């Protein structure tokens, strides 16, 4: 398989970094504007990035870090959220909840209104929950590889 122009492949998926200031829902909608030719049972639409292993986490973090090197405190949306059921985090692409990299006491649902997830600068554990209505300046969209 291959990735569309400007997208980067890793494993069986394609990733693209964008410097766009959007809320979480706007970011997910933005990612859904990208697609690859349908493969039937596999979702061919883009979503905010999901992460399923330490190697994928490291890849995404390195891509994020190298794309934002002029920014000292960059923050980037991930597709992980518990908007449907508090405490039950899910990925927007429907993939399994099988990996997390929360910082410290996160997710803490501070002020009972933090249902979305961002990645922050700092290798290793770097996910923090925050209000979905917040604006973040960066995101990575994820697509399946073209067959």
UniProtKB/Swiss-Prot annotation:
Cysteine disulfide partners in this protein: 3-14, 31-141, 116-132
One Pfam family from the record: Lectin_C
Short sequence motif Cell attachment site: positions: 39-41
Matches recorded under InterPro entries: C-type_lectin-like, C-type_lectin-like/link_sf, C-type_lectin/snaclec_domain, C-type_lectin_CS, CEL1-like_CTLD, CTDL_fold
Keyword Disulfide bond on entry: yes
Compartments (UniProt record): Secreted
Expression sites (tissue/organ): Coelemic fluid.
Residues in C-type lectin domain copies: 1-143
A GO term, aspect molecular function: carbohydrate binding
PTM: The identity of the saccharide is not reported in PubMed:3571253, and it is unlikely to be N-acetylgalactosamine. The sugar attached to Ser-38 is represented simply as Hex.
GO cellular component entries: extracellular region
Keyword annotations of the record: Disulfide bond, Glycoprotein, Lectin, Secreted
SUPFAM superfamilies in the record: C-type lectin-like (SSF56436)
Highest taxon listed in the record's lineage: Eukaryota
Residues with glycosylation annotation: 38
Subunit structure: Homodimer; disulfide-linked.
Function: Role in the defense system of the organism against microorganisms. This lectin is specific for Gal-GalNAc.
Protein name stated in the entry: Echinoidin
Organism of provenance: Heliocidaris crassispina
């Amino acid at each position: 398989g291959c990735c569309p122009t400007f997208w980067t492949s890793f494993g069986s998926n394609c990733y693209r970094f964008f410097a766009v200031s959007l809320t979480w829902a706007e970011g997910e909608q933005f990612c859904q504007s990208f697609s690859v030719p349908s493969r039937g049972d596999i979702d061919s639409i883009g979503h905010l990035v999901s992460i399923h292993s330490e190697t994928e986490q490291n890849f995404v973090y390195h891509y994020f870090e190298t794309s934002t090197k002029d920014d000292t405190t960059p923050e980037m949306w991930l597709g992980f959220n518990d908007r449907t059921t508090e405490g039950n985090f899910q990925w927007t692409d429907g993939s399994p909840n099988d990996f997390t990299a929360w910082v410290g006491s996160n997710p803490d649902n501070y002020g009972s209104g933090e249902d979305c997830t961002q990645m922050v600068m700092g290798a290793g554990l770097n996910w923090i929950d925050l209000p979905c209505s917040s604006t973040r300046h960066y995101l990575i969209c994820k697509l399946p590889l073209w067959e």
